[in-house]
Amino acid sequence: RIPASAAALAGKDVVTSETFTCLYGWRKWGGKGPHQDEEQVADMRLIADALFANGTNQIIWHGMPYNEKGKGKNDNHFYASVHVGPDAYFKDQLKDFNDYMTKVSQYMRKGQVYSDVALYLPLEDSWMGVEYPDSLQMPWVWGEYELRYVFAPDYLAGYQPLWVNAKVLSEATFTEGVLRYGAMSFSALAVDVEWLDIAALRQMLRLAKEGLPVVMAREPKQPGKNKSAEFAALYKELMALSNVSSRPTD
């Protein structure tokens, strides 16, 4: 959802993803990765469909289709990719799979992006969180700064929220009852974070004063070592407005 949100806000039509990297994990050094050369199209389709469901409309193969003449996948390989050469494990399914991804990508580029709610991206949470717990770490994933496990809250299901950040809020306008940024418009702003930069809070207050409905699902804290007394005052002023609520289901 993050790259799809960025594309919509920037007015871009194509959302790409380098796909199928380290499909079953990887080996840190030497040799092939787990089940390399045994890749299943069924597994790759699960990944492709998940990307499509989150707004991707252009799959880029992270594959290795070439080898020196007369040599095969056992002579030359890249540990993080899927082998898609003439001796690929799934060569008989490759064309149909590519055709499927092409067709879905074409459909995904039709029409206009729709969203009803702007959702504040918890970037400050990722900076303050530092490391993921062991249960969420992988050999190539350790830090919250990567935003790999950031999801829209369940109470926004059906509203098709797009992520926005402080820059978007600072440049957005509230006119004719909607929040506008580029070609996108939103009827409300939802904020569900533990930490919030004071600059973003100022923009939220500005827009709320202009009439934008705002949901502050949690009371955020100010990140960083140096705190400002203004933060609490701004938050109090924001929550006193009639168009600002702390109850997402209202």
Language model: regions and residue ranges:
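Carbohydrate-binding surfaces of carbohydrate-active enzymes
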Residues: 1-250
